[in-house]
């Protein structure tokens, strides 16, 4: 259910972004060609040092040559396992979208990591319970082949003691019973 909420939020965000882009393109077309801002490099790694001298030289050279329009190129957004592509997306708008995305990203990962860490022991416990439930028969068996337990062998010994231990005793008891049962006639 949580996955549905994320995908729905993503779809809504993409729809809003698409509407914004269309509105901006219509306004830009209606207002005419406005001078484009200089293209700047976005820092994707906030802690890294960036050498800006070469970029400044390029910008100065471009300003002297005259204002250049920002080329339109496709914009591809990967989010939540999905990919959204916008055709002919202006570079300045792409920079604005990147700025907006980076400002909103600061608080979101901290919340997700905290929730994930809180769920880990519960998930681990549930996983172990499933594992043990599937293998409880294996855990109960001490060896791969069943051996009679000592309690079972002791219980069967008294039955063996009741029977005669010698074959001679068996013959003697059989002959005594035969003598009793036989009919003797004396004349």
From Swiss-Prot:
Identify the main location.
nucleus
- Could you state what the record's PTM comment says about this protein? Ubiquitinated. Targeted for degradation by the SCF(COI1) E3 ubiquitin ligase-proteasome pathway during jasmonate signaling.
User: Which stretches does UniProt call biased (Basic and acidic residues)?
Assistant: 154-163
Q: Which GO terms describe its biological process?
A: regulation of defense response; regulation of jasmonic acid mediated signaling pathway; response to wounding
UniProt cross-references to Pfam families, sorted A to Z: Jas_motif (PF09425), tify (PF06200)
Which subcellular locations apply to this protein? Nucleus
Q: Which family does it belong to?
A: Belongs to the TIFY/JAZ family.
Expression is induced as follows:
By jasmonate, wounding, and cold, drought and salt stresses. Down-regulated by abscisic acid (ABA).
Its function, per the record, reads:
Repressor of jasmonate responses.
Give the motif span (Jas). Answer: 121-145
Free-text comment on this protein's domains from its UniProt entry: The jas domain (121-145) is required for interaction with COI1.
Gene this chain is encoded by: TIFY11B
Q: What is this protein called?
A: Protein TIFY 11b
The record describes its quaternary structure and partners as: Interacts with COI1B in a coronatine-dependent manner. Coronatine is an analog of jasmonoyl isoleucine (JA-Ile).
Q: Which InterPro entries match?
A: CCT_CS, TIFY/JAZ, Tify_dom
Please tell me whether the keyword Transcription regulation is annotated for this protein: yes
- Give the Tify domain ranges: 68-103
Region Disordered, annotated ranges: 139-168
Where can the motif Nuclear localization signal be found? Answer: 123-130
**Matching PROSITE patterns:** TIFY (PS51320)
User: Which GO cellular component does the record give, naming just one?
Assistant: nucleus
Instruction: Report the superkingdom from the record.
Output: Eukaryota
| Residues spanning the signal sequence | none
Key words of the record: Jasmonic acid signaling pathway, Nucleus, Transcription, Transcription regulation, Ubl conjugation
